[in-house]
Amino acid sequence: MAITKIHPIKSTLNLAIDYITKSEKTDEKILVSSFKCHPSTAHIQFMKTREDNDTKGTVLARHLIQSFLPGEVDPIKAHEIGMELCKKILKEDYEFVLATHVDRGHIHNHIIFNNVNYKTGKCYQSNKKILPQN
């Protein structure tokens, strides 16, 4: 069963995205996907969405980590599960970058998504009750 945690990113958004998309962690970036942005420029797109919607909050993005038990899933299946989670909780309303890490004893997904809904301009409301425990 996957364990999911989420926390806010209030600064260094570019460094967080750079970290999760590192080649050595993501099987040479094969296990990196994104929605409404390109991973290498996602931090710029996130900030543009904030500016376009005149958002003033301190949270720039959210970092969701989805961890699997050793041997529970293979890297491709973990990435697919991460995409399903993004569709379920973000509903194609938030730009995101998904990276599946395979450099540790357990496979895990990192999802960094914009705190601002690119359609409505409203900020994401974090609610642990909506995060599934796959």
What is each model feature region?
Residues 1-134:
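N-terminal nicking endonuclease/strand-transfer module with a His-rich metal-binding environment
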